[in-house]
Amino acid sequence: MTEQRPLTIALVAGETSGDILGAGLIRALKERVPNARFVGVAGPRMQAEGCEAWYEMEELAVMGIVEVLGRLRRLLHIRADLTKRFGELKPDVFVGIDAPDFNITLEGNLKKQGIKTIHYVSPSVWAWRQKRVFKIGRATDLVLAFLPFEKAFYDKYNVPCRFIGHTMADAMPLDPDKNAARDVLGIPHDAHCLALLPGSRGAEVEMLSADFLKTAQLLRQTYPDLEIVVPLVNAKRREQFERIKAEVAPDLSVHLLDGMGREAMVASDAALLASGTAALECMLAKCPMVVGYRMKPFTFWLAKRLVKTDYVSLPNLLAGRELVKELLQEECEPQKLAAALLPLLANGKTSHAMHDTFRELHQQIRCNADEQAAQAVLELAQ
């Protein structure tokens, strides 16, 4: 940043979640430095905030080994071109938003040229492939972390890291309105309500839906008024779930929802879900939950040897204890899942204690992440 040149921030986002983060960061930076320039790889939200897109985000948004191999030459070309063009531009700071396989190497290339680099959103190095932390440390001047235990991990390896809180915690109210959510979904206020969230990936829906449906059948025996809501992320997952339900529980009445996962969580007395970001969202919705997860035996065997954490769900990792029940592999079966959910549906001491802890954890990670990220960028730019 000079008197002649405005503050120039280069950014690369590789998927929709990164585009949302990038847009929030740009917005917060523009409030402080209205004439700042933003360039790089951007999605529609970042572009709407004024980011100049050298490449469209969709160019990087490839998933799966086969897809990546098919696009490898193009991806390597883009990374080489960005290394050259950012090297010539000499931005005040480069921010790589998530997409670690693409961004961390790019960050390293730019850091060697004297450009200050930030990696926004820590990869799960604390959970597996922990040696990646050394590459991240060499490639970046700063990591921006959503969760406090991530910062503790980086501190252990002397890698500069700033805990900024989680954008999802900023976006969700501390005290959600359950009755308003029920009105939206058409659920009576006095009914018992269970949310089933069998995952967003095809493999998860295939592995979990049958057990989740059988669990709901068992719970309906105890709670005949039980309303069951099943939010599904897209038409493919809905079609897949409907096929499995027709085979396993054709007579079980459920509310199938297109998206609306957050509304389903807020409306429900309890949720049965696959692990992942959904568990964090469910915690922020203050919905007591049980995590059920199953994968192919070899994958599970491998995961047990690679994963270095005691828990798989983010609420438990945040709490540092088994706050929510995790039933994995052979434990993920209808009788055990139903037994774990029954006390939560009763809305007694168990669910009230869980709700209170969820609220405390929400407050811990509700730090105005966009503003914190913007402050970190400006401090590094000076």
UniProtKB/Swiss-Prot annotation:
Note the Pfam families from the entry: LpxB
Gene Ontology terms: biological process? lipid A biosynthetic process
Q: InterPro entries recorded for this chain?
A: Glyco_trans_19
Q: Name any GO cellular component annotation.
A: membrane
Q: Which UniProt keywords apply?
A: Glycosyltransferase, Lipid A biosynthesis, Lipid biosynthesis, Lipid metabolism, Transferase
What's the EC number here?
2.4.1.182
Region forming the signal peptide:
none
Q: Which reaction does it catalyse?
A: 2-N,3-O-bis[(3R)-3-hydroxytetradecanoyl]-alpha-D-glucosaminyl 1-phosphate + UDP-2-N,3-O-bis[(3R)-3-hydroxytetradecanoyl]-alpha-D-glucosamine = lipid A disaccharide (E. coli) + UDP + H(+); a lipid X + a UDP-2-N,3-O-bis[(3R)-3-hydroxyacyl]-alpha-D-glucosamine = a lipid A disaccharide + UDP + H(+)
Domain of life the protein comes from: Bacteria
The pathway noted for it is: Glycolipid biosynthesis; lipid IV(A) biosynthesis; lipid IV(A) from (3R)-3-hydroxytetradecanoyl-[acyl-carrier-protein] and UDP-N-acetyl-alpha-D-glucosamine: step 5/6
Gene Ontology MF annotations? lipid-A-disaccharide synthase activity; phospholipid binding
Which HAMAP family does the record associate with it?
Answer: LpxB
- Function of the molecule: Condensation of UDP-2,3-diacylglucosamine and 2,3-diacylglucosamine-1-phosphate to form lipid A disaccharide, a precursor of lipid A, a phosphorylated glycolipid that anchors the lipopolysaccharide to the outer membrane of the cell.
The entry assigns this protein to a family as follows:
Belongs to the LpxB family.
Task: List the NCBIfam families hit by this protein, alphabetically.
Answer: lpxB
Protein's name according to its UniProt entry: Lipid-A-disaccharide synthase
Query: What is the scientific name of the source organism?
Result: Escherichia coli (strain 55989 / EAEC)
List the taxonomic lineage. Bacteria, Pseudomonadati, Pseudomonadota, Gammaproteobacteria, Enterobacterales
